[in-house]
Amino acid sequence: MKVVFLEDVKGQGKKGQIKEVPTGYAQNFLIKKNLAKVATAAALSEVKGQAKAKEKEEAELLAEAKALKEVLEKEDTVVEIKMKVGQTGHTFGAVDKADIAKALKSQFNLKLDKRKIQLINKIQALGTKDVPVKLHRDVTAVVKVKISEA
């Protein structure tokens, strides 16, 4: 029996997938638990419509990410963070992902999730650092972060 999976079923299929499964398994388990439905013409067209909508949404997200990358990688886009510095030249504290996200919001009005900023170690020295930001699975931008003395 051909079914359309409504949810991911381990070892059988993923959501939206059309697959041939044993009739008893389909009727007694998958359909009863609302994990799948019979693959009728209406169900197949619905799946195609959902796939098209998802593809369109994915394309929009990719376009947004590319536009944001253009803004972040402009020459004049430098995130400046001021920190107190000791006599030896080391900063008191460190700059982390949340600080960079907050500075982007306040200086350039760009709301960026701190989890997208790929800072491996906190920044503890004065100067300019290039910090990668993963905007989309296919788009990664590099933001210049300048740590200066307050």
From Swiss-Prot:
Keywords: Ribonucleoprotein, Ribosomal protein, RNA-binding, rRNA-binding. One of its GO terms (biological process) is translation. InterPro entries: Ribosomal_bL9, Ribosomal_bL9/RNase_H1_N, Ribosomal_bL9_bac/chp, Ribosomal_bL9_C, Ribosomal_bL9_C_sf, Ribosomal_bL9_N, Ribosomal_bL9_N_sf. PROSITE patterns: RIBOSOMAL_L9 (PS00651). GO terms for cellular component: ribonucleoprotein complex; ribosome. Pfam families: Ribosomal_L9_C, Ribosomal_L9_N. PANTHER family: 50S RIBOSOMAL PROTEIN L9. This is Large ribosomal subunit protein bL9.
